[in-house]
């Protein structure tokens, strides 16, 4: 699996490239993880409702084709897009989501942070505050979109929405939970490698 660092990009550009990659790939195309940092943007999943936008701002709102509700992406957040052939891997969608969640939990363990899941709300949490979100699109057994992990960012835009559709859901970030100040690139590389290891262990 290849890891590609896209640097800082507008969301729409990367979303378009994900669709192009997924439509063009064949059974021999190598899976890829794209790491990226986005300019400020709200993205709505296919289950998102307008009432989850609580106030207006100059941050753009984009309706996407991923699963889930509304979330925020911005500078200081690690985003990893998972372009993976599930059929070739031999796992289902539910298992792939579990792989992503467990990879985030394992990354946070390396910073001595105990994270957990919530049965009624997707994502990864620390003391019931959301630190990571995820949402996938599956097309012909191939995934795109992926995960976002809050690292060192302005969290105030989350106050303008019900994150992932949940009212009064608290959010947190890595810099508030550890004195370690690894760079965004370092964290993205570490999480990507953990993801690759989890995928390899679950290959059938």
Curated annotation (Swiss-Prot):
GO terms for molecular function: lipoyl(octanoyl) transferase activity. Residues 27-204 form the BPL/LPL catalytic domain. GO terms for biological process: protein modification process. The keyword Electron transport does not apply. Keywords: Acyltransferase, Cytoplasm, Transferase. SUPFAM superfamilies: Class II aaRS and biotin synthetases. Pfam families: LplA-B_cat (PF21948). It is found in: Cytoplasm. Belongs to the LipB family. HAMAP family: LipB. This is Octanoyltransferase.
